């Protein structure tokens, strides 16, 4: 039993890495499925449009899904049309762009994975580049090749070109090599940028490493317990209402947070060094509805947590 709990604890502690690994495997599988089942290069002047659509359209869909599935995005935008100060509070307008930037970076993970895998495979890029009409690109691709390369480049990816088999294979390998080089450049750039932004966020942290670790643990536990409490109180309230309805009785008072309390607890968290609140809910419970002066607050997002604080 102890061994099972240790294994479970290990997986819970590494769930972020496991999640990214699962996302990478899912991306690789999806790309291979697209390449083998859905992708059929037309071998015509439409090659460029067809290849680029298969290369970038799934990445765009993944980006949109990333925003849809990001809880921080909905926490940021819910009710903003009715009360614009939720996202643009006084003297803290930059906070909105800071949080939006963090949401965007999180949503870009899946699209970058897709583009990287697709470029490393080379199928989509090969089809797209074989349909180019750019003289400059044709000179680069068909350098040292017969004139048929200029006229029938769009047929190379299908093996229907009148060029010699060796020349046609060299062109295909050259296009695939270009695609793989771009793929590795994208992976290296994304990795370096991720490291850079993480280091910058840690360097700008207002709390120490140990306090940050405690903050992450608290945020996760609060999130789990909040979900349980929401379910518990929803069950109690629905049970009370149904019972009173069917028994035709007047309901007893049911303690619930006020509308203002719900609004205050739903705001983005701003860290105050003199008053160490680890979440918006923590702040509301300690201070009620009194607001801390906003110019003394600093918006912070915990890297690697599932909740915006």
Curated annotation (Swiss-Prot):
Its main location: membrane. It is a multi-pass membrane protein. A 1,2-diacyl-sn-glycero-3-phosphate binds at residues 32, 37, 121, 202. It is found in: Membrane. Keywords: Disulfide bond, Ion channel, Ion transport, Membrane, Transmembrane, Transmembrane helix, Transport. Oligomerizes to form undecameric cone-shaped channels. May assemble to form large pore channels with gating and ion conductance likely regulated by membrane lipids. This is Calcium homeostasis modulator protein 5. It comes from Rattus norvegicus (Rat). The lineage of its organism: Eukaryota, Metazoa, Chordata, Craniata, Vertebrata. The gene is Calhm5.
